[in-house]
């Protein structure tokens, strides 16, 4: 795991600031990847490969990057917005990081190893019926069988999962990449599909800041920003942390997410002095035994769902976040669904 993690870290740094030697080696592979990805999508669009239409509208929230775009909080915000408008929403996802490959409809007893950390977090934050499966269509069928009153399904990720037809496509794109001219497809870059793919989605949500003035891939553009909530105790969420009392304490921050630096910066921006940071691979397993010794250990919500109730973690605290999307993305989705659905 350490060697794999180190190699992945090198590649991610290359994606952010390309190394000429690596680009020379990886560029041909990116060209091959582009041809394979384009053919796969064309096969689904032409009907050469079969795709399935669920009996309710499907809204896909995904990205053309290989993770780290801030998509999960945006999915939670969209689902909550639709719920506020009286829509019975369900969520489907692949469930990255879980140990089982079987379709699983989440319930109060579901654990991260059953569902994956992100779907479990979405389920707990929104209360929306949720199912996971490597086949999004199969997960959708299972979800509708368990909750037949669902009127709309939001697919967390899956923009490239063309085996499931969708009625609305939402692409999340990081603001930091909107002005870049050196983006490339995997493995030389972090893109799963070319930038031109953004021309065919219903809307683009720019996450984490303002977009470059020249970035306008869609006539329908939304922007999201992250707001942090009050830090709470892991084993007693009603107890809020008084950050003022941390001044003379040892504080360690731990994150198993795609862009851990964002989490660490958020804590520092709150005036918290973090003595040590621990960055784990995205979706990494984590338990109380893995946490460093400190007066206070602060973790992400995504990591918090991996801990079982009743474990002695009195010194572990959780920083909640939420996405603020402007303008109203939920209203846009409902307006879009009044039009003729787009079969993909």
UniProtKB/Swiss-Prot annotation:
Swiss-Prot/TrEMBL catalytic activity: a lipid A disaccharide + ATP = a lipid IVA + ADP + H(+)
Nucleotide-binding among keywords: yes
Pathway terms, separated by semicolons: Glycolipid biosynthesis; lipid IV(A) biosynthesis; lipid IV(A) from (3R)-3-hydroxytetradecanoyl-[acyl-carrier-protein] and UDP-N-acetyl-alpha-D-glucosamine: step 6/6
GO BP field: lipid A biosynthetic process; lipopolysaccharide core region biosynthetic process
EC supergroup of this enzyme: transferase
Organism: Neisseria meningitidis serogroup C (strain 053442)
GO molecular function: ATP binding; tetraacyldisaccharide 4'-kinase activity
EC numbers on record: 2.7.1.130
Positions of ATP binding: 65-72
Keywords: ATP-binding, Kinase, Lipid A biosynthesis, Lipid biosynthesis, Lipid metabolism, Nucleotide-binding, Transferase
NCBIfam families: lpxK
Purpose: Transfers the gamma-phosphate of ATP to the 4'-position of a tetraacyldisaccharide 1-phosphate intermediate (termed DS-1-P) to form tetraacyldisaccharide 1,4'-bis-phosphate (lipid IVA).
SUPFAM superfamilies in UniProt: P-loop containing nucleoside triphosphate hydrolases
Any one Pfam family match given in the protein's UniProt record, by short name: LpxK
Protein name stated in the entry: Tetraacyldisaccharide 4'-kinase
Protein family: Belongs to the LpxK family.
GO CC aspect terms: plasma membrane
Keyword Heme belongs to the record: no
């Amino acid at each position: 795991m350490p060697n794999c993690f180190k190699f992945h870290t090198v590649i991610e740094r290359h994606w952010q600031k390309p190394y000429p030697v690596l680009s020379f080696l990886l560029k041909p592979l990116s060209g091959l990847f582009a041809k394979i990805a384009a053919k796969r999508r064309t096969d689904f669009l032409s009907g050469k490969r079969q795709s399935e239409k669920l009996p309710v509208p499907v809204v896909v929230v995904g990205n053309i990057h290989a993770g780290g775009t801030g998509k999960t909080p945006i999915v939670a915000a969209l689902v909550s917005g639709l719920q506020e408008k009286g829509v019975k929403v369900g969520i489907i996802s692949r469930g990255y990081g879980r140990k089982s490959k079987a379709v699983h409809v989440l319930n109060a007893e579901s654990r991260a190893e059953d569902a994956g950390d992100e779907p479990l977090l979405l389920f707990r934050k929104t209360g929306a019926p949720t199912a996971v499966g490597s086949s999004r269509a199969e997960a959708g069928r299972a979800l509708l069988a368990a909750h037949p009153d669902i009127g709309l399904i939001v697919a967390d990720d899956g923009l490239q999962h063309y085996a499931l037809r969708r009625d609305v496509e939402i692409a999340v794109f990081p603001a930091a990449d909107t002005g870049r001219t050196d983006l490339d497809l995997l493995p030389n870059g972090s893109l799963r599909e070319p930038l031109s793919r953004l021309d065919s989605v219903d809307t683009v949500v720019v996450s984490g800041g303002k977009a470059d003035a020249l970035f306008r891939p869609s006539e329908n553009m939304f922007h999201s920003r992250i707001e942090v909530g009050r830090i709470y105790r892991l084993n007693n969420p009603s107890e809020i942390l008084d950050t003022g009392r941390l001044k003379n304490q040892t504080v360690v921050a731990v994150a198993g997410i795609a862009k851990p630096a964002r989490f660490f910066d958020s804590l520092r921006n709150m005036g918290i002095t973090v003595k040590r940071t621990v960055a784990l691979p995205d979706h990494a397993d984590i338990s109380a035994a893995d946490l460093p010794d400190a007066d206070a250990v602060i973790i992400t919500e995504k990591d918090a769902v991996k801990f079982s109730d009743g474990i002695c973690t009195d010194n572990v605290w959780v920083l909640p976040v939420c996405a603020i999307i402007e303008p109203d993305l939920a209203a846009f989705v409902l307006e879009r669904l009044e039009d003729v659905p787009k079969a993909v």
